[in-house]
């Protein structure tokens, strides 16, 4: 039996004025341009990833079922509850009393919660299950 995981949710604090420097033209993955040495602006990560503060939450990934989508154990998800669920979107779902993060696959008679790791099986959700699509994942923040 799979161990149940608990997600801990956090609210964004967009009032925080702790902006950090952002290289204005991006970081070159090839040869850098000397002309771009001093093009910098300030950015708030909360303001950059939060579009609807009242409906946005953060949660950490627990497990390996979504590694193929770039969601690794311990990554921080940005979740927007105001977005409509759509086929192919990655969503945080509450299924039969447990939270999970999976890719949505909407069929005519059911919803499939698709893992992005072949070691995990898709979960078919139908009228016999309790399903709440809690929010849509919009960004993932990770350590490198």
What are these language model-derived features?
Residues 1-67, 99, 106, 110, ...:
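Short, positionally conserved secondary-structure boundary motifs
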Residues 79-86:
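Short acidic low-complexity segments
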Residues 74-75, 89:
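Structural motif
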